[in-house]
Amino acid sequence: MRRTLYRLMIELTNGRFTSYILRKFAQSRFSSIIIPSYAKVFQINQDEMEKDLKEYRTLHELFTRKLKEGKRMIHAEAAAVVSPVDGIFADFGPIEESKTFDIKGKRYSIVDMLGNEERASRYAGGTYVVIYLSPSHYHRIHSPLSGTVTERFELGGKSYPVNAAGMKYGKEPLSKNYRSVTEVDSEGKRMALVKVGAMFVNSIELLHKRNTVQKGEEMAYFTFGSTVVLLFEKGMIEAVSTLTSGQELRVGEKIATRLTS
């Protein structure tokens, strides 16, 4: 019953018109009125921001803010795979040979997440990593490793929240929400960077358009808090064993080690 009521409320409020109005407001000068309150409520670290709080003209500018030079260091170890975002580590684990994985008591299909069987088959037996971004986090997305971009594509339409309630009651938000996917070949192994849209504001702006990418390079940004799912091919990485659910991560922090072929 709770799941049914939750989904009904989301469907009634999560239409294109509602999303359009909220997006237009966030991009308007009127939204600047609530910036101080927003920064206070979500405890945004203003010392790291590239500009002073009063210099942001809209909520959108604050959401997509850059940081001061040197505030995020990319792990220098050649074999290190790094966090692509500032966020809260949710989980990591094996992708079953059936091309599924379980998180928070819900089973997710890689076929659904990536749109077809051919793409999903590459990751059977591999590893997944999930990182959640709250509205307070820095919203820019960086590459976790170096390699060659093999494909970019978008899937999905409406988006359920990706908070605790959304993960519990939503329609498999990680594989059904609007999502923007970048696949990267790194030394003969494939990784998928799945950027999952949040409720109301689906916008994910791609910044990286070249064929090659360097570890730590900026790739995209969310316009609001959301989630990143990383999928790694079998035998590609070994996740850092000390990672724990709820742990804060920063861009450039080591989350896994590349395994040698």
From Swiss-Prot:
It is a peripheral membrane protein. Keywords: Cell membrane, Decarboxylase, Lipid biosynthesis, Lipid metabolism, Lyase, Membrane, Phospholipid biosynthesis, Phospholipid metabolism, Pyruvate, Zymogen. Its cofactor is pyruvate. Its EC number is 4.1.1.65. It is found in: Cell membrane. Pathway: Phospholipid metabolism; phosphatidylethanolamine biosynthesis; phosphatidylethanolamine from CDP-diacylglycerol: step 2/2. One of its GO terms (molecular function) is phosphatidylserine decarboxylase activity. GO terms for biological process: phosphatidylethanolamine biosynthetic process. The modification Pyruvic acid (Ser) is found at residue 226. It comes from the Bacteria. Pfam families: PS_Dcarbxylase. It catalyses: a 1,2-diacyl-sn-glycero-3-phospho-L-serine + H(+) = a 1,2-diacyl-sn-glycero-3-phosphoethanolamine + CO2. Is synthesized initially as an inactive proenzyme. Formation of the active enzyme involves a self-maturation process in which the active site pyruvoyl group is generated from an internal serine residue via an autocatalytic post-translational modification. Two non-identical subunits are generated from the proenzyme in this reaction, and the pyruvate is formed at the N-terminus of the alpha chain, which is derived from the carboxyl end of the proenzyme. Binds 1 pyruvoyl group covalently per subunit. GO terms for cellular component: plasma membrane. The active site is at 86 (charge relay system), 142 (charge relay system), 226 (charge relay system), 226 (schiff-base intermediate with substrate). Signal peptide: none annotated. The record marks 225-226 as: Cleavage (non-hydrolytic). Heterodimer of a large membrane-associated beta subunit and a small pyruvoyl-containing alpha subunit. Belongs to the phosphatidylserine decarboxylase family. PSD-B subfamily. Prokaryotic type I sub-subfamily. Catalyzes the formation of phosphatidylethanolamine (PtdEtn) from phosphatidylserine (PtdSer). NCBIfam families: PRK03140.1 (NF002853), PS_decarb (TIGR00163). This is Phosphatidylserine decarboxylase proenzyme. The lineage of its organism: Bacteria, Bacillati, Bacillota, Bacilli, Bacillales.
